[in-house]
């Protein structure tokens, strides 16, 4: 776990008040595990003082190396500040934090269940499971359709069940 200043490579509103923020991945994050999170600090100053705990949502190869994504809802000043970052700006993060989870090697069929923003770390897992040739069914839940992670952003072979 280290404090790192990461450059923003992409930022977008995905749906409703949910945003994705892609950041350059520092070397200290190479060992990140599914289910881990970062504390993202919402300014270069001390207001707001506390970081925001945000799950590591996805990983990818970018133009300048590995990148990781944070998926979050805008619910206050801190997450609003994060949502307004643009490529080239920086965000300070501490992590990876928490006890991630592993998948048993012999399991071929996986059922992943997540609701609302709670599905964020499962998307990275689904990406990797599909890449490994495993079958994935994902149950996405939310209070309304507006709070469901868009199924078209999942790998095409993932079977999706939506519940509201």
Language model feature labels by segment:
Residues 2-87:
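Ferredoxin-reductase
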Residues 77-164:
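FNR/FR-type flavoprotein reductase catalytic core
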